[in-house]
Amino acid sequence: RIAWDEKESKTLYYSLKDIQLFIAGLSMSRLHILQGISGTGKTSLPIAFARAVGGGCEIISVQAGWRDKGDLIGHFNAFEKKFYEQATLQALYKAQCPTYADRPYIIVLDEMNISRPEQYFAEFLSALELDPIKRKLTLMTSSQNNAPELLIDGKGIKIPENVWFVGTANHDETTYEFADKTYDRAHLMTLPRHKHTFEVDKTLGPVTFSFSSLEEAFEEASKKHADTVASIIQEMDDSDFLEVLDNEFNVNWGNRFERHLMRFIPVMLECGSNIGIALDHMLATKVLREGKATGRYDTDGENIDNLIEALESFWENCTSLKGKPEACLKLLNQELKKKSQT
């Protein structure tokens, strides 16, 4: 259902791993960042997922020069006593209406980093860290007469629990880098160019999955595999890998990273993947990513060698981890190559 877009008569070729990572990310965070070169399907993936599960989807084209939330959701004209809303605000309201209130709803921020997300998306970043019941935005300072009934006290709006934000990102001279706080809170994926095609069943009819059933499945997975993930976290905490990270790179992880692991890894397992692939992805995107443990000027080749050795040793000694940490090793070996050329 993800692969075949009947409306557009278009076939989308995503790998099983890409789908597994995307779904597990939904359990982990309400904010996704999809990276990759043009043409890899960054915008199409969330649209296809929403279509496949019978959910809602709104595409927001981020514009250069956005500075604050008013650019994203609209602004109140005090003289006219009128709120000029943008499509994002309409989507937040629509997601709460009866048709979509119990369906997954995805708001795609296309070219999210063509402006600085930490400016125009700042209030959303803060709100998404709160308990679902506390996630809301203030639209105006005082309540207005005849305000839409789903507004809070006639002057604010809830960020519904069934809403996910998916930002697509390019990295070139026209865009900005994301701040650490954005990367730390988001689920990050880099979509590769899809070289392989496969047979697609175009006869599958539409289905609808409720938001509540999706959340229930996520919760059941988290409970089922909680002890397994907790054991992996403890082994990492006691490993030479963490000691090298801390002593030579001044990098560690906190409660948020561990919470993300407790949500992400179980869903990956239930989607048919394994702990090694899941942990490899999380370490590569959260701990070893460019600018954190790699891409730095205060480390040298010896530091990278020590980190590779510690990582491989941890992987070999941990019986629940299969294969090799391919994403992590690719990052570290690329970094080692850069160091050798300077």
Predicted regions and their residues:
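AAA+ P-loop NTPase catalytic core and its hallmark functional loops
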Residues: 1-216
